[in-house]
Amino acid sequence: MTDITTKPDAAGTDLYALQLSLQREVNSRIAANAKDEGSRPQAFLVCDFEYLFRRDAHDAWCYVRGAECDDRGSVKVPKIKWPFHTIAAVSWMIMQFDGHSAIPHIEPPVVMTLADHDEIDILRALFAALDALGETGRMVTWGGEVRDLAVLRFKACRYGLPMPLHLHDTSPYARERIDLCRAVTVQADPVHLDEYAAGAGIPSKPSPAKEIGKLVEAGEFDLVHDHVLADVLTTSIIAMRWLAAKGEISCDRGRGAMAVSDVSAAAFPDSKFLAGNFRPWARDELRRSRLAGRVYRIEEIA
């Protein structure tokens, strides 16, 4: 087999010239596409979910199936997997980048819970938002490929709802979606949303992640509401940073954070997470982005 990556003798001059020409064309197209990616209008729907376990249905399945024991003879307690999950809360927010302004257009976030809506109404509203986003817009989650998307497809089948285009391609690398957890992790150890956020200095989760299921089952939907909203705000900031670092969008991170903060606070003025955590952080981000050089915090100097 001839290696055309090395310069051939005179007999292969034409082939070598063709190879160089093709390489230049490919490199030119890649550079042009990268430039166009950041300058064309783009839209992203960032979403997050919380669940309520259908324990009665799961217990019935376990009873019919029969108990399973481990090597010591102890009965195993089966994990309640996604076919037995009810969507208890969902939040989403749409970010639009026109390719020219450094400030994204942020649509007011939406939060829906079982306190005010049936599950099928929650699904219809989310699916309608995805349909309105269009085929060029992308759905953004943190770890959505692991559970959330499976639940959405399952519920669409259960209720007879047409799935939005963003759920059709079942590949975890589908162009219509971004799983940020998978994207930033690649082959490294997977991390939780609040774990990544803590490392990046972004506020997250007003309630401990392990407690949210208990809050759902206790019907504490005011706390659940703030929690799922917080997850979307955190994920949105991570998404903006990730997309900007890849050159897919052009965005001023300080003003982008303030845009998310201002729109969200106007939509949910009573949110404790926004008032106590996110808005002070966003203002700090804006101040820091306007200063040149190193910005020292009091706790860093002490």
What is each of the regions a protein language model found here?
Residues 1-302:
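DEDD superfamily 3′-5′ metal-dependent exonuclease/proofreading module
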